[in-house]
Amino acid sequence: MFKKKNISLAVIRRLPRYLRYVEDLLNHDVLRISSSELSQRMGYTASQVRQDFNNFGGFGQQGYGYSTQVLYENLVKILGLDRNFKMVIVGVGNLGQALANYANFYKKGFRLIGLFDIDPQKVGKTIRDIKIEHIDKLKDFIKKNDVDIGVLCVPADVAQEVADIMVEGGIKGIWNFTAKEIEVKGDVVVENVHLIDSLMVLSYKLNEKLLEKERIK
């Protein structure tokens, strides 16, 4: 598959949305769609849609548009969803438990194979048939099972320490839900998720609407 180098993060962040939409089209037996139709429904320009896809080879045919099946298959490969990445969650509090029970991970091909915590009241219990192990076993578990992704749901003050254990075990990527910006060595990939940031963006949008109404009065 052709792929340009240095694809912008903005393009990459649009890919999951494309995938969700194309998946919905397939579920409704829509076999093809044009870039203009896709752009109108998603709120992008047709030019932007074409440019996004051209980063990876295009996928479309002039005069035909895009086969939704071909588009879906390519997006799955681009996003690596066909690799069935193995994951562990460290920190099985409210957020960790919610993530462990999130069925979409399995539907999208991610395999949750381990849960870890330090709380003796949680260790030994199971979620979705996965036994919660003590964090002391984390490094060896990652090595033995060649785990790809570590999901970090621990308190911020221990986030770096746990991330270091993951890296020592050979983790390839860390999905960080803590408030701590962790540092990693080597080629480990980190994706930080700050839930409060999204809420503050919503707050900004609501505030702008209220300010606009106040100006009109």
From Swiss-Prot:
- GO cellular-component term (any): cytoplasm
Residues within the DNA-binding region(s): 17-56
Q: Where in the cell is it found?
A: Cytoplasm
Q: Which UniProt keywords apply?
A: Cytoplasm, DNA-binding, NAD, Repressor, Transcription, Transcription regulation
Would the keyword Isomerase turn up in this protein's UniProt record?
no
Q: Mind telling me which residue stretches traverse the membrane in this protein?
A: none
Q: Where does NAD(+) bind?
A: G91, V92, G93, N94, L95, G96
Query: Molecular function terms in GO for this entry?
Result: DNA binding; DNA-binding transcription factor activity
Biological process, per Gene Ontology: negative regulation of DNA-templated transcription; response to redox state
The principal localisation class reads: cytoplasm
- Describe the protein's quaternary organization and the partners it interacts with: Homodimer.
So what family is this one in? Belongs to the transcriptional regulatory Rex family.
Give the function comment from the record. Answer: Modulates transcription in response to changes in cellular NADH/NAD(+) redox state.
Name used for this protein in its record: Redox-sensing transcriptional repressor Rex
Q: What is the source species?
A: Caldicellulosiruptor bescii (strain ATCC BAA-1888 / DSM 6725 / KCTC 15123 / Z-1320) (Anaerocellum thermophilum)
The beginning of the lineage is: Bacteria, Bacillati, Bacillota, Bacillota incertae sedis, Caldicellulosiruptorales
